[in-house]
Amino acid sequence: MKSEAIAMRHATPAWTDIARDIGDTFAARAAQHDHDGEFVAKNYADLRDRRLFSAGIPTELGGGGASHAEVCAIVRELGRHCGSTGLSYAMHSHPVCANVFKHVRGDAKATGALKKIAANEFVIAGTGANDWLASNGEAIEVDGGYRVNAHKRFVSGGPGADLFVTSAIFDGDDGPEVIHFAVPMASSGIEIQGNWDTLGMRGTGSNDIMMQDVFVPAEAVVARRPVGTWHPMWDVIVPVALPIIVSCYVGLAESAAAYALQSASGKPHQAPAIGQMQNDIAVATMALEDMIRIVDNYAFTPDLSITSDVLARKAIAARSVKSAIETASEIVGGPGFYRGHPMERIVRDMRAFHFHPLPERIQQEFSGRIALGLDPIEAR
């Protein structure tokens, strides 16, 4: 079978062409979004107008039919032009793609959700940071569902989202468990804090969100799991999500390389540094393409070993992207140290890569524990 990594290179170009066409507009806006710490709202409007938010949904459900590899290619292209837009779009796309994985296996809830997203070109935002294994917040059972109070962080794309995907802890008769659910972002009791003022990725709008007595209908709950332990659902989410997220940063590194090559024109003494930078980008690209190959357009069978392999490749890509961008910055030199130069912004945006699960040291422990036959996460 032809691998998805190879298929990505020869995919029907329509979606990446669209991303490239609007990417020039996004690049022109990027400096202002970064300077103001302002959410990329106009870019989201352009993405919606071109139905990119439903691109990864199968055509039979009303979407654009882009494969997992093609979604990664879209994100990579957006990342070349505006890191904040690429990352925000990635954070919308990965829960969509996780639902595609479930849809092709007959999950009726996932199918229904995808149809609704495609019909309305809905945008998703979910929680990040450490809000996954342990979760946070409290869900109290009430008539017809739950009442949730929580403080959620790193909600990328929140200001432009229609749906909020998150979780909370429900302490029922059988003990505490985490419930996962999606609710409209406009639900009563949801308040976006407007506190995203960061080093990099300043246009993602990844603000904190306060949930105060938010009603979650019982039918909105899509999963339940124990608190603080590894659950098989992550063996779907992690392999599907990480190649999409990594694609943004590989695109960012490719953008940095373009500025470096432009700066090094006519300077043969820069050849060794250019070669080093290209090597790092090659390593990051190989890691990304192998992640996409592993997912195989949703044909993979979830397993801890696959999750570990994908996490290892994410760590390799992160290290290589960081090295490539730092070298590119050295090649560009002093001009790239000034505010307003794209290289200065790219250097700061790259710093966000570390924070996506799992940071390298934690990944090494995770993969090492699996190799030793231990549970991937030590009980704490």
What are these regions (language model features)?
Residues 1-17, 379-380:
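Basic/polar N-terminal segments that are highly enriched at the extreme N-terminus
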Residues 251, 275-282, 311, 315-322, ...:
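Generic structural signal for well-ordered, non-transmembrane alpha-helical segments
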Residues 335-380:
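Glycine-rich phosphate/cofactor-binding loops in nucleotide/flavin-utilizing enzymes
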Residues 198-282:
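Glycine-rich beta->alpha junctions and the first turn(s) of the following alpha-helix
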Residues 153-158, 242-244, 353-356:
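Glycine-rich phosphate/pyrophosphate-binding beta-alpha loops
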Residues 27, 31-35, 265, 283-316, ...:
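C-terminal helix-coil-helix/basic helical segment that borders enzyme active sites and/or dimer interfaces
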Residues 39-49, 53-160:
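Glycine-rich flavin
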Residues 154-192:
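A short core secondary-structure module
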